[in-house]
Curated annotation (Swiss-Prot):
The gene is secA. It comes from Ostreococcus lucimarinus (strain CCE9901). It is a peripheral membrane protein. GO terms for cellular component: chloroplast stroma; chloroplast thylakoid membrane. It is an enzyme of class 7 (translocase). This is Protein translocase subunit SecA, chloroplastic. SMART domains: SecA_DEAD, SecA_PP_bind.
Amino acid sequence: MLKGDPSEKTKKRYQARVDAVNALGARTKALSDDELRAKTEEFRERLRRGESEDDLLVEAFAVVREAADRVLGLRPFDVQLIGGMILHEGQIAEMRTGEGKTLVSALPAYLNALSGKGVHVVTVNDYLARRDAEWIGQIHKFLGMTCGLIQAGMAEEERRVGYGSDVTYVTNSELGFDYLRDNLAQNTGELVQRDFNFCIIDEVDSILIDEARTPLIISGVADKPSERYIQAAKIADAFEKDYHYKVDEKQKSVLLSEEGYEAAEDLLQVTDLYDPRTQWALYIINAIKAKELQKRDVNYIVRGQEIIIVDEFSGRTMQGRRWSDGLHQAVEAKEGVTIQNETVTIASVTYQAFFKSYPKLGGMTGTAETEITEFSNIYELEVAVVPTNRPVSREDSTDVVFRSETGKWNAVRKEISRMHKKGRPVLVGTTSVERSEQIAELLDEDGIPYELLNAKPENVERESEIVAQSGRKGAVTIATNMAGRGTDILLGGNAEFMARLRVRESLMQRVVMPEDGEIAFEKKGNLAKSGGNKWAVKEGLYPCELSAETAKMLGEAVDTACSVWGDRSLEALDAEERLSFACEKGPSEDEAILALRKVFNAIEAEYKVYTSAEKKEVLGLGGLHVVGTERHESRRVDNQLRGRSGRQGDPGSTRYFLSLEDNLFRIFGGDRIQALMSAFRVEDMPIESGMLTNSLDEAQKKVERYFYDIRKQLFDYDAVLNSQREKVYFERRRALTASREQLQEQMLEYAELTIDDIVNANIDTSEPVSEWPLEGLVGKLRQYCYYFGEIDESDIRPIAEKGGVNALRNFLVKKGQDAYMTKCGEVEATEAGLMMEAERFFILSQTDNLWKQHLQAIKFVQQAVGLRGYAQKDPLIEYKLEGFNLYTEMMAQIRRNVIYSVYMFQPQRLEQKEEAELVGAGGDQKPNSRKK
C-alpha cells in the first residue's frame, strides 16, 4: 500500500469490527436455518428493549453473511463488510467495479430494517431494481423479512405493498414521483409511501451529481398553439449561424443578432418580437436551440411520433421525461413529429432536496473520490474509499491525442483491429448514439463482428445479455457511457448468467400469461425469427450445445413448472422472481423450483467447461482492453469506463484516443489548445506534449468546476423553494390525515390568522383610536363572513378605545371562531361528516391551486433576479426576499380562501338518487358527491 492511501485508512478504522464479525463465523455457521431466521425477531426485541442498531451491528452482519452464503453461495469478503459499515454510518462507500457493491447493500439494509421503519435501496433503472430485489431480496426473505419492488406502471396498491415492506428496491425517479404524487393525493387511500427512514443509493454519483440539474416535475396541460412552434422551426432552419444568431455552447444558450431580430419580425409581420402578449422571442430562441444545441442521436432519439431524451451521463433513454419551457415542443417541430401541448408545473422537486429529506442516507459508487467536495458541501456526506479485495493490476496508458477527429477515428479503428486479432476482448466507450454507430460502420467495413449497446430500444432490451458476454475471447462491444450498467464483465464469459438465460428462454414462453394482442402479434410473423419466442436470445450467445441428457432434463423441468404453476398463468415479474430463486441456493420445497435448480446447475457446469478454458486464454492475452473515444466533462465518468477492466485483480488495460476537435476541448480548451491546433498540421500523427497533457487535464477540471458551480447555485436557489415546499406539504398532509378534532383545530387557527390579516390591513396602530376606520373594518368583515352582519361600528369602538388593538383583535377572533362553530352545527345537521369532507376538500384544492401558481411566480422571480447583479445586488439575497414575500402571501391567501369557502358553504338536501355537490370558492375541483 502507498503511504497515505485513503483505503488503508478506511481499513484501519473498521478492522476491529470486521474481526469481531469474523469471530462469530463458526458460531453462526452452526445454527440451523430456523435458528438463523429466529435471530431477526431476537434483534427486533433487543431494539425494543433499548439497544441501538450500532449495538447489533456485529451480530447482524454475521447473520447476513451466513444467510448470503446459504442462499446465494456468496460469502461477503472483509472489504464488503467494511463497505456495509460505511453505508450504515450514513456515508458514501467508494468501491471499485467488480468488488460486489450489490451484495454490500444487503448488510446495512437488513440491520436498519429491524426497526420496522423500512429501508429504500435505490438504483438507476427498473432492470437493476428488479434484479436486486429478486437476487439480494432472497437473503432478506430467508431471514424472515419482507422485500418490496417498485416498477414503472405498477398500480397504487402494489406500490403501497412495496413501500410497506421491510426493504424496498426502487429507482430514483419512481421514488421521487411517488413522493410528489403522495403530496397531490385527495384522500389517505391514495397515499403509497410511509415516512422516510434510511436510503441506500447505488451509483450515488450518477443520481446525486449527474442528475442533480434535472428536477422531477409533475405537469398539467396548458394550451399553446402548435402552429407557432412550426413557424419558428422554419425560421430557425432558414437563419444562418453567426449572422442571424450566435451560439454559446458552453452556456448552452443562443442570442439573436440585430439582423436576426429584424428578419424574424419581418417574416412574422410583427412589430415587437418581445411583446409579452405573443412571446414570439421565446419560440424563435427555442427553435434555434433545437437546431444547434439538441442533436438527434446525441441528446435524443426519435421513436415513432415521440422525442425521447437520452441521458448524457449514462447513455440511457429517459422515457417520459420532457424538456421544459417549450424546448421539447421546439424539437418536436424540428423533427416533424406530433407536437404535444405545453405544460404547467403542478409539483416539482430536485434530487438534491428530495434525498436530503431522509434522516439517514448512504451511497455506493466506483468513482466518488473526485467529487468529495460536492458530496460534503451539498449533501453533508463523507466519502470513504474501500480497499480492493485483490490488488488492481490494470494498466492505464497515456492518452493518444490527434489534431483532428479523422486522425482519431482511424487510430481507434486500428487499435480495435489490433486487439481483436490478438483475441483480446475490447470495450469501446462512446459519448453518444451517433458516435457508437459511426464506429459500428467502420467495423462493418473491416469485417469485425461487434455488439452495439446504446440508447436505441432494440439494443437496450439486450443490455445485460450484451454486457455479460463482453469478456469473451475476441468480443468487441461498443457502448455509450457505461455508468450504472450493473452487470459485471467476466473474462471468458459469464457461465452462470448464460445458464440462467438458457433456462429462461425455455421456461418463460410456457409459464408467462400472454399479453393483450400477443396472439395477433405472433400471427403477423414478427416473432418468426425467434421461433415465436420473444424470450429467445441472440443466436450464437451460448458457448456450446447442451448435451442430450441435459436438454431432456430442461424439457422435463419446464413441464414440471407448467404442471405445478399452471400453463401460461404467471405475471412476467412473478415468473422472473421464481426463476431467480431457482438459480440460487435458498431452501425450497417447491417441486418446480427444485427441478429448475437441478437443470440450471447442470447447464452452468457444461458452460463452465468452455468459459473457464476461455478465461485462462483471455487472461494470458492480457484481459479486457478498454478504448475511450472522448474525455467526458467529468473525470469520474472516464474512470467509470476504465473501471470496467481489471476487476478483482484481473489483468487489463485502457487507452483514451482524443482529438483537439472533441467538444470538451473545443468549448473549454482555451487559447493554449487553439494554438496547438494551429501548430500541428498532420492529421494521423499523434501529438505528444507535456504542455498538451496539462492543458487537457486543466480543460476537464475547468468543466468540472463550471458544472459544480451550476449545481451549487441550483442547490442554493432550490433550498429556498424546498423550505417552502416542506411547509406547504406539511400543512397539506396535516389536513389530509387529520381527525375531526384536528381538522376543527386547523380551521379555528385559519379563522384567527385571517381575522388578524384583516385587522392589520385596515388598522394603522400609529394613529389614535378615534382615527381608526372601524366602519370600513366592519364592512370588510361582513364581506368575508355574513355572520358578522350583526356587528356594527358601535359594538367595537368602545372595545378598541378601552383595550386597544389587542382587545379589538381578541373580540373579533372570538366572533369569527363562534361563527365557524355555528356553521359546523348547521352543516352537520344536513349530513353527519359532511363538514369534515368539505373542509378537507377546500384546503387541498386551494393549496394545490395556489402552490401551482406560486411555482410559476417564483420561476419568473428567479429569472428576473439574475439581471440584478448588474445593479450590484446579490441575486440570491434578492430571490430569498422576494420568494419569502410571495410565500407568505400565498399561505395567507390559502387560509383566507379556505375559511371564506367554509363560511359561504351552503349544502342543500336533494331528492334520493340526485347528487349533492359542495359549492364554494374552492377552485375548479369538486369533492366526492354524496347521495341523500
